[in-house]
Amino acid sequence: MTEENKSFYITTPIYYPSGKLHIGHAYTTVAGDAMARYKCMQGYNVHYLTGTDEHGQKIQKKAEELNVTPQAYVDNIVAGIKELWEKMDISYDDFIRTTEDRHKDVVEKIFKQLVDQGDIYLDEYEGWYSVQDETFYTEHQLVDPIMEGDKVVGGKSPDSGHDVELVREESYFFRMGKYVDRLLKFYEDNPHFIQPESRKNEMINNFIKPGLEDLAVSRTSFDWGVRVPGNPKHVIYVWVDALSNYITALGYGTENEEMYKKFWPADVHLVGKEIVRFHTIYWPIILMALDLPLPKKVFAHGWILMKDGKMSKSKGNVVDPVILIDRYGLDALRYYLLREVPFGSDGVFTPEGFVERINFDLANDLGNLLNRTVAMIDKYFNGEIPAFKANVTEFDETLVTFAKDTLKKVEEAMENMEFSVALSSIWQLVSRTNKYIDETQPWVLAKDEDDREKLASVMAHLAEVLRQTGIMLMPFLTVAPSKMFAQLGLTDEAHTSWGSLSTIGCIPAGTKVEKGQPIFPRLEMDVEVAYIKEQMKASAPKVEEKKEEEPKAEEITIDDFFKVELRVAEVLSAEPVKKADKLLKIQLDLGTEKRQVVSGIAKFYSPEDLKGKKVICVTNLKPVKLRGELSQGMILAGEENGVLSLASIDQNIPNGTKIK
């Protein structure tokens, strides 16, 4: 493989600097950092790009409210973002800002080319616009539409729930439909382009098949942005401006395109699921129009949610990553983000879950294994790691095989962006190694001089597995591995490189261990949970709200309750109900039968999030039709502040089990 073939280009979305970043933003960037570090350790020439999308009406309005220029406003926030990435040890290679000349100059060239070749034309537009989302919607897409007779006169954004306004203005349009067939052919020829797979079906069925309308790509209602060449009253809109960052950052369209030629097309764009459409429909079509290669993969991850839905200052549930890092250390946060949630799915942050991960995984499992190993080597062999010999005890080969299999699992998971799976595999090795200590009982072997060779083998195997564990953790954790290596006396980088994982037992005999402080101290659960909750409450606006008392429900008898039949059901599949933004058509497995239920949870759960979930279903309701679809029951959910959360069941309860 040539050096050129070993390049790897990974990007995050460029973040919108409208306020302070929270743990959700950190999630994407830490994931990108883990992937970049992994590829770098494998010998790839890695280029990791992040940055900020700094133009638009929302930025201009915020700046006006604060009586500062838009540039001064974004400069201040961007400084904070860079400080956060430094604190999180993000190893990005470039930070692109859309207000930089290197970006703006090329965006003007791109827009002019698209106009000159007829892909962009001037016309007039009328549509429902959300300033918060900087997105236009059709009246059929609006949530809670306000009607006057048969006419829609208002409503809310389906993405953020903010109010929309009817906007009529002159605009430049991109001929999207011209490239639809070519885009679908690209999907067919590149089946792994959109990940997870379910996102591809969503793009095709929800956006392309209904008909891809021409896209408004300029605005005249604000002036904070890149001007349209030759028509300066128009500002180039976000679709062309922001998305182009992935190539402008590489020098595309300049006199020096060396970086562009080396790294484009991107190996993977990491994006949140809310911007999949822009990266898998608009961006590929723009690139097709420019006759440029398309990125190899777009990976759409889920959201870090709270128990009461999305993070929001008004709810007092925003988690500031800086607070967690300052109190618990960087590795605790990085580990939690990448371990807790499968990367393509939504996950829920809870203070309890965060502290449990630290105590059980980091302190108990990994920390104790390191402490016990170093202490025993110090006690039984004067702190010197014995020479590695194979198959001295009956348990040695099993442990070595387990370690080799773990490496394969980790590498396979990383190639699929399955960070949680990779970390789970590493922790299975840690658990297996703790079991190896119980099996070999070194404290018993130490009592008999005839077992000296076995004791030495156990110590060498423990040190070796810890070496391998530390190396495999290096993409994820940036502090603990070096502490592990220091306690194991490993100072030669040849023994801590990814390539050294293929050599079992490469620690030189006599390497001196050094006892140290626990790398992850145990936490007091109650104290730390209370602390995190208090910090989250502090994020809420200081406004006293009087909570209305909920009316008490009418009391029923136990006989009334027993009339309701509740059973465990597993979601087999789900899909949107046509012309009904809030409804999902859900197929359930009730053990002895399959049923269809229509539920108003589409705003809170995507179809792919539901698949495989165990839910509670009311099974003896009279079937009804909702929007033309038969509903044969009802799934239970709780509601708080307008956010629905499904009642769920442990996975080990069989489908169809009656709830009593």
UniProtKB/Swiss-Prot annotation:
Compartments reported by the entry: Cytoplasm
Pfam families: Anticodon_3, tRNA-synt_1g, tRNA_bind
Keywords: Aminoacyl-tRNA synthetase, ATP-binding, Cytoplasm, Ligase, Nucleotide-binding, Protein biosynthesis, RNA-binding, tRNA-binding
Residues annotated for ATP binding in this entry: 313
Motif 'KMSKS' region, residue numbers: 310-314
Record PANTHER family: METHIONINE--TRNA LIGASE, MITOCHONDRIAL (PTHR43326:SF1), METHIONYL-TRNA SYNTHETASE (PTHR43326)
Name of the protein this chain belongs to: Methionine--tRNA ligase 1
